[in-house]
Amino acid sequence: MIAVGIFAKPPYPGSVKTRLIPDIGAAKAARVYRYCLEYTLQVVRESGLEYQLFLSETCDDVLFQQEEHSLQKGDGLGQRMYHAFQELLDTASDGALIIGTDCLDLTPMHLQDAARSLADHELVLIPALDGGYALIGCTTIEPGLFRDLLWSTDKVYRQTFANAQRLNYRVTSLETLRDIDTLQDLEHYPELLALIASS
């Protein structure tokens, strides 16, 4: 079995999509985040893979009430992902995938392709155009995988790939996708522009 971990935040205005706030305001940025979160959940459900949410903090939002979830553990993103992989791999014997909630180009097929790739690789990445990644998956997790990464920079994908090679992972990368962080990113998604215009 392969399981998907979805890293998510409560969709509170002011705490999500913060790079959009100067351009569209906190309330509209939160609506964009909620749209992306709902899209991500639908994609994962349609993939047929088991999944679990990992929340940054407790939240009673209706989106999370019917979903199995855990709280993220650790001080930085690397530690939180490491602990989430540990939790997922306790029950997912064939591997685990972790995604965020800001990639509207991600499809069920991308998840299925990533899951299949773990049959003959120990680590899979879906790079993002901004230099990060939309998905990371592995069959085993090493503490050094996320060591010394410059998070929120265009170096994250390359640094993770290099760490994986040093740790002797068999690595594969799939199609590069766009994620949504800035107003320029929104312009590629008419549905998000319509959402902003109507709210």
Q: What are the language-model segments listed below?
A:
Residues Q65-A96, T153-V156, Q184:
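Short phosphate-binding loop-to-helix
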Residues I99-T101:
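Active-site acidic Asp-centered loop
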Residues L106-G131:
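Conserved donor-nucleotide/metal-binding helix-loop-beta segment in metal-dependent transferases, i.e.
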Residues R31-L49:
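A short, N-terminal amphipathic alpha-helix
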Residues Q159-S199:
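Conserved alpha/beta core of the MobA/IspD/sugar-nucleotide pyrophosphorylase nucleotidyltransferase superfamily
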Residues E142-F161:
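Short, glycine-/small-residue-rich phosphate/pyrophosphate-handling segment
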Residues L55-D61:
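Short, polar loop motifs at secondary-structure junctions
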Residues M1-R19:
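N-terminal nucleotide-binding beta1-loop-alpha1 segment
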